[in-house]
Amino acid sequence: MLVRGLPLRSVLVKGCQPLLSAPREGPGHPRVPTGEGAGMSSHSPRPFKEIPSPGDNGWINLYHFWREKGPKKLHYHHFQNFQKYGPIYREKLGNVESVYIVDPEDVALLFKFEGPHPERFLIPPWTAYHQYFQKPVGVLFKSSDAWKKDRLALNPEVMALESIKNFIPLLDPVSQDFVSLLHRRMEQQGSGKFSGPIIEDLFRFAFESITNVIFGERQGMLDEIVDPEAQRFIDAVYKMFHTSVPMLSLPPDLFRLFRTKTWRDHVAAWDTVFSKAEQYTEKFYQDLKQKRHFDSYPGIFYRLLASNKLPFKDIQANVTEMLAGGVDTTSMSLQWHLYEIARNLRVQEMLREEVLAARRQAQGDTSTMVQMVPLLKASIKETLRLHPIAVTLQRYPQNDLVIRDYMIPAKTLVQVSIYTMGQDPTFFSNPRRFDPTRWLDKNKDLTHFRNLGFGWGVRQCLGRRIAELEMTLFLIHILENFRVEIQHLNDVDSTFGLILIPEKPISFTFWPITRAPPQA
């Protein structure tokens, strides 16, 4: 029974016992020796069916899952299963069977054997929509050589470290405009500060950022009057995520067959995403054909066209996926980050001091400045530890694999519970504490295969560099201009809406630095 009055997250973490009973090594972030945990054993491994499990009937399991917590608490379901079964277990929900692991050493082994063309779990309703309506797909849905071809063409423009310098002039003005937006909100409230939720503004900020990086042109989403068609796209992405959850364990074709509201809303959301993305790409394609010379970086879309490595339809499909994936994910991460620094004012001041010092030393050069804020970058990792966007990472091993002395057959879905990993004292000392400095420890064993917020390896998040830079610049400008407080210090619980989102709106108070109230 849960303690009355405490949110579920608090009860779970406060009562959390280390998942592994073997003695640990190292201060703060102990690790399992490979031979003891993840390694191959000298004797025959135990069969797959002996992996701890609630039972093999997926429909009975699904019934209990829906009855007890349901999909909105999927991350807590994983957490409690690890508490019950240990560091590895298998579960079949509906027609989806997975093996779940959590120890970083086991994760390292999984990724070591992921193969040259890693495969991950495809979200069933997304796949169903694309197949039923014969929509073009990008790297999110492709596999094998088709995936590799697209990814090799995209990486130099999206993932290469040197590409960051091209993104800064496009992303930095958007962050500056967000500061201006908050000042306008203060003037409207007339109290010398702004108090209220900002998630809708963060959605628009993220959309403005990703479209500017891709197309090299602003959409005006931080103005007082915004384009209603662009707002439709933002709303559609949110609905597309939200309506996916009920169809994760039940076949989407069942929802389609009975024309449920969930399926109809999901289709309408995807239709809007594709329609608007097609309009954007066609418009900018025609504009670019008229213009051959650019005085500055023209955006990812033009660079992909100019490279001539992919046909237009593949560029269009990948741009659509980047647009759809670049709104809710980044905005939610920023909201969680503001939530944590508003609750931890000492950390906020440490971050502010680092940012102000970096600004002075860089003498106004933003490219130099973003290289001089290691604590700020560590704070982003820390936010993603406590509030990961995805609750698991998934892989289908190419060959048979032995983890914890259990044989896992090739092509079995293996899920890494990064939410549980981030909450467990076995892997992070004082896991409930927001402590960015833990990521700055020079002992690499302390962070070994723990920083998984953007995935890992060749199939990590395609938009990682954009998102990291976007969040870094945003937080730099917020910390330079405002002291951020939260109106209620009680824990805000999270809910699973395909990504982890706050269970209730978070209201912040932004004080201009010159008017910030004295610290206690």
UniProtKB/Swiss-Prot annotation:
Official protein name in the record: Cholesterol side-chain cleavage enzyme, mitochondrial
EC top class, as a word: oxidoreductase
Organism, scientific name: Equus caballus (Horse)
Transmembrane domains' residue ranges: none
Pfam families: p450
Transit peptide endpoints, chain numbering: 1-39
One function term, GO molecular function aspect: heme binding
PROSITE patterns: CYTOCHROME_P450
Cofactor(s) it depends on: heme
Subcellular locations according to the entry: Mitochondrion inner membrane
InterPro entries: CYP11_CYP27_families, Cyt_P450, Cyt_P450_CS, Cyt_P450_E_grp-I, Cyt_P450_sf
Gene: CYP11A1
Pathway: Lipid metabolism; C21-steroid hormone metabolism; Steroid metabolism; cholesterol metabolism
Membrane topology: Peripheral membrane protein
Annotated region described as Disordered, given as residue ranges: 19-47
GO biological process: C21-steroid hormone biosynthetic process; cellular response to peptide hormone stimulus; cholesterol metabolic process; cortisol metabolic process; glucocorticoid biosynthetic process
Family: Belongs to the cytochrome P450 family.
Assembly description: Interacts with FDX1/adrenodoxin.
Function (record text): A cytochrome P450 monooxygenase that catalyzes the side-chain hydroxylation and cleavage of cholesterol to pregnenolone, the precursor of most steroid hormones. Catalyzes three sequential oxidation reactions of cholesterol, namely the hydroxylation at C22 followed with the hydroxylation at C20 to yield 20R,22R-hydroxycholesterol that is further cleaved between C20 and C22 to yield the C21-steroid pregnenolone and 4-methylpentanal. Mechanistically, uses molecular oxygen inserting one oxygen atom into a substrate and reducing the second into a water molecule.
Catalytic activity: 6 reduced [adrenodoxin] + cholesterol + 3 O2 + 6 H(+) = 4-methylpentanal + pregnenolone + 6 oxidized [adrenodoxin] + 4 H2O; 2 reduced [adrenodoxin] + cholesterol + O2 + 2 H(+) = (22R)-hydroxycholesterol + 2 oxidized [adrenodoxin] + H2O; (22R)-hydroxycholesterol + 2 reduced [adrenodoxin] + O2 + 2 H(+) = (20R,22R)-20,22-dihydroxycholesterol + 2 oxidized [adrenodoxin] + H2O; (20R,22R)-20,22-dihydroxycholesterol + 2 reduced [adrenodoxin] + O2 + 2 H(+) = 4-methylpentanal + pregnenolone + 2 oxidized [adrenodoxin] + 2 H2O
Keyword Transit peptide part of the UniProt annotation: yes
GO cellular component terms listed in the entry, alphabetical order: mitochondrial inner membrane
SUPFAM superfamilies according to UniProt: Cytochrome P450
Keyword entries, A-Z: Cholesterol metabolism, Heme, Iron, Lipid metabolism, Membrane, Metal-binding, Mitochondrion, Mitochondrion inner membrane, Monooxygenase, Oxidoreductase, Steroid metabolism, Steroidogenesis, Sterol metabolism, Transit peptide
